[in-house]
């Protein structure tokens, strides 16, 4: 709760090792709050969470080092190069410089390693945050809307990397408001609305249960037209599932 407002209520789920689990819903549904509770940034008023087979409150410092959080909060020196920024994190974990090279290649930023952080584009910064979270080879990785606001090319690169990490055995939690992204990445997902879990399962099972399409015709300035088929957005899908109006 935040004051009298209930942010999340009666949420229960299990996640298998090595799968990508998604939280799907519109703004204000509780996705980010869920990530903050799971990563220890917020404390739940009741119930408990378990990670790495332990109740979260009993995780040791060594356990916490196995949990990666992709965050765009402070922690980078704008005037230092991308390489030197990541090198500082590697030293904190006792990792060699070769690990910095590895993660830079993973996120496709190796050729930009000498750029200062202030000169990176939005997409490059997002991959920089991901590289920081990967330095210590975490067993569990949390991402809050990892491709929000990014161009399709950068989004595709991040999607490909997340699928590679999954194949390597990393368990991944992510939030998204994009059903297409959830379908592409997630083994299972939960649909959230106003703090309630209203649907839970594989993307395929949810799509099969609520199989609706919309055909949209776009007219461009040069008067060319194209027709695209869109799955219902999560906002509409959540509205259908919850039978509640959403402001």
Spans of features found by a protein language model:
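ABC transporter nucleotide-binding domains
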Residues: 2-193, 199
């Amino acid at each position: 709760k935040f004051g009298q407002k209930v942010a999340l209520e009666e949420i229960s789920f299990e996640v298998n090792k090595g799968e990508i689990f998604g939280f799907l819903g519109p703004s204000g549904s509780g996705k980010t709050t869920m990530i903050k509770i799971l990563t220890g940034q917020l404390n739940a008023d009741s119930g408990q969470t378990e990670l790495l087979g332990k109740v979260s409150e009993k995780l040791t410092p060594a356990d916490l080092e196995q949990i990666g959080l992709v965050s765009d909060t402070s922690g980078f020196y704008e005037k230092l190069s991308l390489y030197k920024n990541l090198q500082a994190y590697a030293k904190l974990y006792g990792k060699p410089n070769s690990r910095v090279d590895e993660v830079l290649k993973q996120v496709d930023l190796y050729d930009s390693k000498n750029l200062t952080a202030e000169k990176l584009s939005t997409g490059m910064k997002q991959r920089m945050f991901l590289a920081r979270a990967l330095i210590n080879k975490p067993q569990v990785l949390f991402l809050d809307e990892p491709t929000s606001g990014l161009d399709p090319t950068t989004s595709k690169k991040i999607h490909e990397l997340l699928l590679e990490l999954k194949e390597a055995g990393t368990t991944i939690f992510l939030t998204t408001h994009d059903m297409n992204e959830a379908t592409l990445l997630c083994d299972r997902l939960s649909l959230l609305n106003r703090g309630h879990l209203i649907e839970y399962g594989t993307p395929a099972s949810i799509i099969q249960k609520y199989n609706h399409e919309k055909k949209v015709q776009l007219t461009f300035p040069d008067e060319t037209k194209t027709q695209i088929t869109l799955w219902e957005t999560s906002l509409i899908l959540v509205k259908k599932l919850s039978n509640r109006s959403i402001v």
